[in-house]
Design a protein with these regions (language model features):
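Divalent metal-cofactor coordination and adjacent catalytic microenvironments
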Residues: 1-191
């Protein structure tokens, strides 16, 4: 079971005007704006991977062929915000909505994001369960932690200042040391 990103539902945690000011670029240097606008989501994705946290809200879909035996389904989506939809999908792809009440978010949506399943769920009987959740900071979720916003700024600034200086390391997207330290301090640990 892998959560599928269905839709980005919010804005980037750092906008283009904020990054232009952070990089001390004047408003007449519009040639760089397109590059910076493309670097923002890339830097966010790199910081998200390092911190194991979602910095932008999104909607995800999970499809199950069986209800979890212990009534618990860990998800790699932190922070988990809400269960949006629950349904049963038959062989023809028709979705029958069910009350999402028996499916809820676990007690720690940051460090142990999971779904809890109540005992009163209908049997699947050859159908699949479809569950949509929202996850990520911003929007309806909690605010992005300030150290991760700074890590995003530092990452983007490092990439912007050192563009074209890869020294043969094609595809290197390593975080600058200061940004990596900030992301590590906020990292969600796994056992």
């Amino acid at each position: 079971m892998t959560p599928i990103r269905v839709e980005e539902t919010g804005v980037e945690p750092v906008g283009l005007p904020e990054m232009l000011a952070y990089l001390r670029l004047s408003s007449d240097e519009t040639a760089e704006e397109a590059l910076i606008a493309r670097l923002i989501p890339a830097a966010r994705a790199a910081v998200e991977a390092a911190a194991r946290l979602l910095l932008r809200p999104a909607r995800f879909r999970v499809v199950l062929t069986d209800w979890p035996r212990l009534g618990l389904l860990p998800l790699p989506l932190s922070p988990l915000v809400a269960v949006l939809r629950t349904g049963l999908v038959d062989g023809g792809g028709v979705v029958t909505e069910i009350e999402p009440g028996p499916v809820r978010i676990g007690p720690d949506p940051w460090d142990a994001p999971c779904l809890l399943f109540g005992p009163d769920l209908p049997p699947l009987s050859g159908r699949s369960a479809l569950i949509e959740v929202s996850a990520g900071c911003g929007g309806e979720g909690p605010p992005v932690p300030e150290p991760l916003i700074q890590a995003l700024r530092l990452t983007l600034a490092g990439w912007f200042e050192n563009r074209g200086d890869e020294n043969g390391e094609v595809g290197s997207v390593a975080l600058p040391a200061a940004a990596a330290g900030l992301a590590a301090a906020c990292r969600r640990m796994q056992l």
